[in-house]
Swiss-Prot record:
Family of the protein in this entry: Belongs to the cation transport ATPase (P-type) (TC 3.A.3) family. Type IID subfamily.
Localisation: Cell membrane
Chief site of localization: membrane
Annotated residues for binding of ATP: T332, E414, K467, R511, T575, G576, D577, R636, K642, N664
Protein name (Swiss-Prot/TrEMBL): Sodium/potassium exporting P-type ATPase 1
Stated role: Catalyzes the hydrolysis of ATP coupled with the export of sodium and potassium from the cell. Appears to export potassium more efficiently than sodium. May transport other cations such as lithium. Sodium/potassium efflux ATPases are involved in salt tolerance and maintaining the membrane potential across the plasma membrane in high salinity (Na+) or alkaline (K+) environments.
Natural source organism: Marchantia polymorpha
Catalytic activity as recorded in UniProt: Na(+)(in) + ATP + H2O = Na(+)(out) + ADP + phosphate + H(+); K(+)(in) + ATP + H2O = K(+)(out) + ADP + phosphate + H(+)
C-alpha cells in the first residue's frame, strides 16, 4: 500500500484506488491488516479531540475561590512565624488539590470516554461483513457505507452512489448540498468543492446513500489540515459549577470583611494573635470539600446512568433533568419496540382485510381473512396482491441475512416490509436477476414518501415503486382491475373509500402505508433518467393498496408514562403516524387518559389531545398560547413542528426534553432544554444532544430524570450539611471576638487547624455519603424542582441549624471557662507560647471542637430529609438508619477522629491549640443531645407551619 494520505484520489478510477489501497469493494479490508494500518496511520482523530489535559485539571484545583483563601491563610501563617499552622494549611491545600485532581481527572476521563461512545460511528465492510465501529477506528482502505444523516468519518473516494448529496458548508462554504458522482475528476487543479467523487470528513449526508473507500484519516483529512471540526473539543463549566464558583468568590469577599471586623474590634493592632484570629474566620467561612464532593457525585451519576443505557455527553444534562416538566417523545422504537410487523393488507374494493401472522422479524407466517387461512399462491395470483408485495420488497433499502437471529439492517418500517416479502418467497434477492436498480428518491419529511426506479431487464421497461403516507394518493390516477390498469373514474369516491379504510386501520393502532407503482417504457425513459426531477417521476401512479404495520408498545412504556404523571411531568408524543394510529397508541401507553370518573376512554379531560402537524402549524403563536393546554399528541409531525412545540413550551415557562434520531431533528434537540438522541439515530442528532440512549427506550428517559432528581436532591443535602456547619463556626468566631485576654486581644474559641480538621476530615466523608444517598420513595412523586439549588427553605435551614450549633457551642465555651473554670482567658492563647496561662482556654477549645464534630455528624442524618423526624422511617429512623452504609461508617469513624487530637501530647497543644479533657465530656454529651432535640423541634415546626413541598 502506498502513502494513502498523499494521492490525488479524485483523479483515479475506482479500480486504481482499490489497487493502490489494497482493498476490495465487496469484501473490504481483512481484519488481519487493520491493526497494522492503525499503527501506520494512527487513530482517525483530530488533535483537538485527544483526551483530557491533566495540567489544566491540576491548575483548576488552585484557581477556585476556596483554595485562594486557603493559600492566603497559608502565606499569612508563615509570615507571622506560625510554622505549625502554616504547614498544616499547606498540607491541606496539597491534599485537597490531589484528591480534587484525581477525582476530576477521572471524571473528565469518564466523560471523554462517554463522549467517544456517543461520538460519530462508521459502517464499514471488513472481511465481507458489515460492522458499525467508532470513527477513530477507520483506516485508509476501509469500505464505508453511507446513509442520510451520517457524518462522514474520513475523506473517501466514492465507489457507489444513489441520489447522494452532501452538506459541505462547514468545509467549502457552499450553502447548498452537493450532488455526488463516482466518475474520476480529471485535472490537477480541481478544488475541494469540484471533487464531486469525494466526500470529506465531518461533512453530513443530506440525501441518498452510497459507498466509499477511506483514503485519508485523522489530521491528513481536509478538515484536519485546517484543524477545524464540527465535533465538540471541550466541556465548559455547568450552570451549577458556575453558581458554586460565584458562591466561592462571595465567601472570599465575606472572609475579607470578617477579617476587617476582627482588626477593627482589636483597634487595628496587627499582632500575631489578632492576625491568626482573622485567619481562623477566613477558614471558617469556607466549605473546603464542597467542589470536590460535587465533582465526585456528578461523576458517579454519569457512570450510573451509563450503566443504565443513558450516555451523558454534557454534564449540564444532570442538572437539567431534575427540572424537566415536559417530555416530547418519538413513538417508533422509543415508546414502542421498534420491531415493526406487517399485520394487515388491503386491496381496493375489498370489504375485509388480509391478516398476516408472525411475530417480529420471523420470515414465516400465514395469510387469513376473517380468521380463515388462505393459500399464499392463491393470493399471489391476484396481480394487485403480487405487485403490492413486490413493491414492499423493491421500494426498500433494508437487508435481511437471518431475521430469526436479528441479522437485519435498515429502517424498521422497511425491515417489516422486507419480512413480508420473505414470508411469500418474494424477498429482494429473488428479483436481482430481473430488476436492475437505477436510482432512489429517498423519504423526506416534506414528501413523506419514498420511491425507487428499476429497469426490468426482461420487459425492457422501467418500473417506479412508491410507498408513503396518505398523500401518495394525490399522485395516483389509476387502479388495477382484472389485471388491467384503468383510470380512476370518480376521484371523490376513490379518496373517500381509501381514506375510510385508512381510518379503520389506524384505529386499530396500525401505521398505514399507501403503496403504488408505475411502468414506463424504455423509449419514454430514454430522455435521460439522471435528469428526471422527482416531481416528474412520481406522477400518474397506479394505486395498489394499503399496508398496515403494527409496532407493539414496549411493556415498560405504560409504567414509565405513569411515573411521569405521578412526577408532574407531561408526556407528549410527536409521531409521523396517522391521527387515529397515534391516538390508539397514545391511549395504550397512557399518554391520553380517560377523564376522571369516566369509564368511556373517548372522554378525555382536555379539548384537543391530538392534533395533526398541519393543524398545529396553521395556528399563530398567539393562538397556540391561547390554548388551555398544548396537545398531548401531534400526528404527521415534522421536524419544524417539533421546534414549534418546544418554543410553545418555553413560552409557557416549561422545561422540555426532546427525543430525536434523524438529521432533521437536530434543530429541535438543540432548542430543547435536554436533547435526547437515540443510539441508533444519526450522528448529527447525537452531536446535537446532551444524552444518548443506547437502548432507544422511553423508560430509560424516565430513569434519567429520576437519576437527575436524585443527584440534585443529594447535592442540596450535602451543601446544607457543609454550609450550616460553616455558619455555626462563623457565629462562634464572630461572637468570640468579645472574649478578650488581659492584653485586650480577642481569643478565638476555635483554632484554624481545628476548623480545617472539622471541615475537611470529619465533615467531608458524611457529605460524600449524602451525595450517594439512594433516591427516596417520593423522588418521582413530587413536581419538578424549579427554584434552583438554594431555595428559601434550604437557606433557612442553613441559618437555623447553624445558629443552633453556634449557640450551643458558645454555651459550652462559657460553661467550661466561666461556670466550671477559673474565668481566665490567659495571655497569648491564640498561639502555644504561654501554655501555663491557657490551660482553661485550651480545655474549652477541646470541648467545643468535639461537641461541634459530633453535632455535624448527627446533622448528616438531619439532612437526609428536610422535614421528617429521625424517629420516623421517612426521616431515617430505625428501618433506614443503616441503609446508607457509607454514612454509617462516616459517622462512626468521624466520632472517634477528634479523640487522638485531644489526647496525643504536642499534637494537641502545638497544632490544635487545645488540651486534654475529663469532666468536660458530660458537657459534650448534653450539648449534642440538646442539638438533637432542638433539630427535632425545628422540623416539627416546619411540618406544622409549612404545608407546601420543599422549595
Amino acid at each position: 500500500m502506498m502513502g494513502a494520505n498523499s494521492t490525488e484520489w479524485h483523479g483515479q478510477s475506482v479500480e486504481q484506488v482499490t489497487e493502490l489501497l489494497g482493498t476490495d469493494v465487496e469484501r473490504g479490508l481483512k481484519e488481519s491488516v487493520v491493526g497494522q494500518l492503525q499503527k501506520q496511520f494512527g487513530p482517525n482523530e483530530l488533535k483537538g479531540q485527544r483526551g483530557v489535559n491533566p495540567w489544566k485539571v491540576l491548575l483548576a484545583q488552585f484557581t477556585n475561590g476556596l483554595t485562594v483563601i486557603l493559600l492566603i491563610a497559608t502565606v499569612v501563617s508563615f509570615a507571622v512565624q506560625d510554622h505549625a499552622e502554616g504547614g498544616v494549611l499547606a498540607f491541606v491545600i496539597i491534599f485537597n488539590a490531589s484528591v480534587g485532581f484525581v477525582q476530576e481527572y477521572r471524571a473528565e476521563k469518564t466523560m471523554d470516554a462517554l463522549r467517544r461512545m456517543a461520538s460519530p460511528t462508521a459502517k464499514v465492510i471488513r472481511d465481507g461483513g458489515l460492522d458499525r465501529i467508532s470513527s477513530p477506528g477507520v483506516v485508509p482502505g476501509d469500505i464505508i457505507v453511507f446513509e442520510v444523516g451520517d457524518v462522514v468519518p474520513a475523506d473517501c473516494r466514492l465507489i457507489e452512489v444513489l441520489n447522494l448529496e452532501v452538506d459541505e458548508a462547514m468545509l467549502t462554504g457552499e450553502s447548498l448540498p452537493v450532488a455526488k458522482t463516482v466518475e474520476a475528476i480529471k485535472g490537477e487543479n480541481a478544488t475541494v468543492g469540484d471533487r464531486l467523487n469525494m466526500v470529506y470528513s465531518s461533512t453530513i449526508l443530506t440525501k441518498g446513500r452510497g459507498k466509499g473507500i477511506a483514503v485519508a484519516t485523522g489530521m491528513s483529512t481536509e478538515i484536519g489540515k485546517i484543524t477545524k471540526s464540527i465535533s465538540e473539543t471541550g466541556q465548559s463549566s455547568t450552570p451549577m459549577q458556575k453558581r458554586l464558583n460565584r458562591m466561592a468568590y462571595i465567601l472570599f469577599g465575606i472572609s475579607l470583611v470578617l477579617a476587617v471586623i476582627v482588626f477593627a474590634v482589636n483597634k487595628f493592632e496587627f499582632n500575631t494573635d489578632i492576625i491568626i484570629y482573622a485567619v481562623s474566620l477566613g477558614i471558617a467561612v469556607i466549605p473546603e470539600g464542597l467542589i470536590a464532593v460535587i465533582t465526585i457525585v456528578m461523576a458517579l451519576g454519569v457512570r450510573r446512568m451509563a450503566s443504565q443505557q443513558a450516555l451523558v455527553r454534557k454534564l449540564v444534562a444532570l442538572e437539567s433533568l431534575q427540572a424537566v416538566t415536559n417530555i416530547c417523545s418519538d413513538k417508533t422504537g422509543t415508546l414502542t419496540q421498534g420491531k415493526m410487523t406487517v399485520t394487515t393488507l388491503w386491496l381496493p374494493g375489498m370489504e375485509d382485510q388480509y391478516s398476516i401472522s408472525g411475530n417480529g422479524w420471523e420470515t414465516s407466517g400465514e395469510i387469513s381473512v376473517r380468521e380463515q387461512p388462505i393459500d399464499a399462491q392463491e393470493c399471489l395470483s391476484d396481480l394487485r396482491f403480487r405487485l403490492l408485495v413486490e413493491c414492499s420488497a423493491l421500494c426498500n433499502t433494508a437487508n435481511i441475512v437471518e431475521a430469526s437471529e436479528g441479522k437485519v439492517w435498515g429502517d424498521p418500517t422497511e425491515i417489516a416490509l422486507q419480512v413480508l416479502a420473505y414470508k411469500l418467497q418474494m424477498g429482494k434477492p429473488s428479483f436481482r436477476s430481473r430488476k436492475e436498480p437505477i436510482t432512489e428518491y429517498p423519504f423526506s419529511s416534506a414528501e413523506k414518501r419514498m420511491s425507487m426506479l428499476y429497469r426490468d431487464v426482461e420487459r425492457d421497461a422501467f418500473e417506479i415503486y412508491t410507498k408513503g403516507a396518505e398523500n401518495v394518493l394525490a399522485i395516483c390516477d389509476r387502479l388495477l382491475e382484472k389485471g388491467e390498469e384503468v383510470e380512476i373514474s370518480s376521484r371523490d369516491e376513490f379518496m373517500q373509500s381509501v381514506s375510510a379504510q385508512i381510518q379503520i386501520m389506524a384505529k386499530q393502532g396500525l401505521r398505514v402505508l399507501v403503496v403504488a407503482y408505475r411502468t414506463v417504457s424504455e423509449k419514454e425513459m430514454a430522455k435521460s433518467v439522471s435528469k428526471w426531477e422527482r416531481v416528474d417521476v412520481e406522477r400518474n401512479m397506479t394505486f395498489l393498496g394499503l399496508v398496515g404495520i403494527r409496532d407493539t408498545p414496549r411493556p415498560e412504556s405504560r409504567i414509565a408514562v405513569d411515573q411521569c404523571y405521578e412526577a408532574g411531568i407531561i408526556v407528549h408524543m410527536l409521531t409521523g403516524d396517522h391521527h387515529d394510529t397515534a391516538l390508539a397508541i397514545a391511549r395504550e401507553v397512557g399518554i391520553i387518559r380517560p377523564a376522571p370518573n369516566s369509564a368511556d376512554e373517548s372522554v378525555v379531560p382536555m379539548s384537543n389531545p391530538v392534533m395533526t402537524a398541519a393543524e398545529f402549524d396553521a395556528l399563530s403563536e398567539e393562538q397556540i398560547d391561547d390554548l388551555n393546554e398544548l396537545p398531548l399528541v401531534i400526528a404527521r409531525c415534522t421536524p419544524a413542528t417539533k421546534v414549534r412545540m418546544i418554543e410553545a413550551l418555553h413560552r409557557r415557562k416549561k422545561f422540555a426534553a426532546m427525543t430525536g434520531d434523524g438529521v432533521n431533528d437536530a434543530p429541535s434537540l438543540k432548542k430543547a432544554d435536554v436533547g435526547i438522541a437515540m443510539g441508533a439515530g444519526s450522528d448529527v442528532a447525537k452531536q446535537s444532544s446532551e444524552i444518548v440512549l443506547t437502548d432507544n427506550n422511553f423508560a430509560t428517559i424516565v430513569m434519567a430524570v429520576s437519576e437527575g432528581r436524585r443527584i440534585f436532591s443529594n447535592i442540596r443535602k450535602f451543601i446544607l450539611h457543609l454550609v450550616s456547619t460553616n455558619v455555626g463556626e462563623v457565629i462562634v468566631l464572630i461572637i468570640g471576638l468579645a472574649f478578650k485576654d488581659r492584653n485586650g486581644v480577642s481569643v478565638f474559641p476555635l483554632a484554624p487547624v481545628q476548623i480545617l480538621f472539622m471541615n475537611m476530615v470529619t465533615s467531608t466523608p458524611p457529605a460524600m455519603a449524602l451525595g450517594v444517598e439512594a433516591a427516596s420513595k417520593d423522588t418521582m412523586k413530587v413536581p419538578p424542582h424549579t427554584k434552583g439549588l438554594f431555595g428559601k427553605e434550604v437557606l433557612a435551614d442553613m441559618m437555623v441549624y447553624g445558629i443552633i450549633m453556634g449557640s450551643l457551642i458558645l454555651v459550652d465555651w462559657v460553661l467550661v471557662i466561666y461556670a466550671f473554670g477559673d474565668s481566665q482567658l490567659g495571655l497569648e492563647c491564640n498561639s502555644d507560647r504561654m501554655l501555663n496561662e491557657c490551660n482553661t482556654v485550651f480545655r474549652a477549645r477541646s470541648t467545643i471542637m468535639v461537641a461541634l464534630i459530633w453535632m455535624l455528624l448527627l446533622h448528616a442524618y438531619n439532612c437526609r430529609h428536610p422535614r421528617a423526624s429521625l424517629f420516623t422511617a421517612e426521616g431515617g429512623g430505625a428501618s433506614k438508619l443503616f441503609s446508607n452504609r457509607l454514612l454509617v461508617w462516616s459517622v462512626l469513624l468521624g466520632s472517634l477522629m477528634p479523640i487522638p487530637t485531644v489526647y496525643i501530647p504536642t499534637l494537641n497543644t502545638k497544632i490544635f491549640k487545645q488540651e486534654t479533657i475529663s469532666w468536660e465530656w458530660s458537657i459534650v454529651v448534653v450539648s449534642v443531645v440538646a442539638f438533637f432535640f432542638l433539630s427535632e423541634l425545628y422540623k416539627l415546626i416546619k411540618r406544622n407551619v409549612m404545608t407546601s413541598r420543599v422549595i
